[in-house]
């Protein structure tokens, strides 16, 4: 039995070292927004910033002013109130009276065969005037030169679609463990640097920042094609790639900021609708997704504590490598590398988030989102 543990931890250590090397090389290939010179205003195509807001009265007063304070010469902001029950619409109208940059679109009903968010973003697109469309969320904050630098980056690389990785504010050990591990899996596990290669089939999209050429958006089908996609942000990147357009990912941890969820319970609740959807509502894929955190983060820690001899040595190498890779990703994200020590806890939480998403979705027979229920059969039939 001891020789089997030596072989197991030796394999995990080797895979960890190779993965860490590939991750390090890959992350260095991603362009950083802060290193991009802003576009010249006399060469700036028009941009429409579009976001949907449902019951966002608490967060809008902090985020919306940053969208209206851009140094870019030709842009507008289209805010879509999606059937809010709080003061969201009043706040939007108040800002619109103070700024000619802001236009408010009010959605009062949700048509059949649409998710609320995708319908609201589609409604925003239909009134937007820009040559480029920037989809974001109602709680995201921008620095004043984000548009100028993002457009310069997209044009310099010849991209039709640019996703920026945002900085996420985190507080408390449990929240840090859950979000930082989720972020590491998203960045390192998915190998997002492959997206920037034209021949790669890899795709990406995050709700905080997606800048897309209007032609690419329309020819790919836009949010109408994603009407029942729970992870519409990721799938927008997919359909743009499928339509033959060029897509890229950049880093804007300082320039684009968001407080994703407050507290670990809200983090777990917030991804319950997403995790199973990201795995195509496939139970076997979900079961397989539980294995990497178990193999690379949890069992090496147990090996260091419980194993002996070479098995413990290899377990230690595997654990140290994963912690170093986690610290490297956190450091690039402007977070303390010491948060990497929460990696095994984050792995446990990550596996629980997947398991909970599968169990809740199957138990309910679908997804409940913002007081609306969407049957699982219908969601599966309309996946891109």
Each model region followed by its residue ranges:
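Short, well-formed alpha-helical segments that are part of the catalytic scaffolds
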Residues: 31-35, 56-69
